[in-house]
């Protein structure tokens, strides 16, 4: 299913063929991530740039990952580009018990910025309670400096979600994931989220993330 606002509507030719080819390639990549060491695909996957839940339903039904029995948690957001975030999870590994969508209250020049929701999902991963926040913060369109306050406000929304979780469990295990359109050295992380970590550890994470770039750069 392709929304009327989708960039795919601008394509000439067989849109359906392009769509199903992309679904097949995405599912193929997902099936390969970590498979060499774990013999399975990821237990949880945060996704962004999702047009509607039908896209996710088509994805998890792909022959590459159908047997993994992925569940879907998705909310429609008010984003002006009609794209959302969502969570995919293997039902045998992760058991969700709560989920909620939050829209950042972001304004620029006294006008509301319609951006993606932030998705909170709580559940048990191998019998251990964890909390996931899936993000897709405002882009750097118009320049990094000009758009920086938007991402800082998105980060602030993350802090409110984290506070909500920690009110019930001060020692809660929280994973913040997604497309932040920012780097660990930016103020959204260092000043707003107050993220801390050893530089060597951060570099290892970045290097490991880069290993997957050839897989998805098709």
Regions found by a protein language model. Give the residues of each.
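Loop/turn elements at helix/coil->beta-strand transitions in domains of secreted/extracellular proteins
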Residues: 40-44, 67-70, 126-130, 169-174, ...
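Sec-exported extracytoplasmic/periplasmic mature domains
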Residues: 31-35, 55-65, 93, 160-170, ...
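Active-site metal-binding loops of divalent metal-dependent hydrolases
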Residues: 1, 50, 137, 179-180
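Active-site His/acidic residue clusters
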Residues: 5-6, 128, 132-147
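A Trp-anchored, charged/polar loop motif used as the substrate-binding/catalytic surface
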Residues: 24-30, 112-122, 156-163
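N-terminal, active-site-proximal structural segment of metallo-dependent hydrolase catalytic domains
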Residues: 1-65, 69, 73-79, 83-85, ...
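Metal-dependent phosphoesterases centered on the DNase I-like endonuclease/exonuclease/phosphatase
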Residues: 150-218
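Structured beta-strand-rich core segments of catalytic domains in phosphoester-bond hydrolases
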Residues: 50-129, 137
């Amino acid at each position: 299913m392709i929304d009327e606002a989708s960039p795919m509507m601008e394509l000439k030719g067989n849109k359906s063929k392009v769509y199903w080819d992309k679904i097949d390639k995405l599912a193929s990549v997902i099936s390969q991530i970590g498979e060499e060491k774990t013999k399975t695909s990821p237990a949880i996957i945060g996704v962004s740039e999702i047009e509607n839940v039908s896209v996710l339903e088509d994805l998890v039904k792909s022959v590459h990952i159908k047997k993994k029995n992925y569940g879907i948690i998705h909310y429609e957001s008010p984003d002006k580009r009609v794209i959302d975030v969502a969570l995919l999870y293997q039902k045998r590994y992760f058991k969700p018990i709560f989920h909620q969508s939050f829209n950042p209250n972001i304004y620029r020049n006294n006008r509301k910025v319609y951006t993606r929701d932030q998705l909170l999902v709580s559940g048990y991963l191998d019998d251990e309670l964890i909390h996931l926040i899936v993000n897709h913060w405002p882009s750097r369109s118009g320049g990094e400096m000009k758009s920086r306050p938007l991402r800082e406000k998105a980060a602030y929304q993350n802090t409110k979600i984290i506070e909500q979780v920690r009110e019930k469990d001060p020692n809660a295990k929280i994973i913040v994931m997604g497309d932040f359109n920012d780097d660990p050295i930016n103020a959204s992380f260092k000043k707003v989220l107050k993220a801390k970590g050893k530089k060597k550890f951060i570099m290892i994470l970045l290097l490991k993330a880069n290993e997957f770039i050839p897989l998805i750069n098709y």
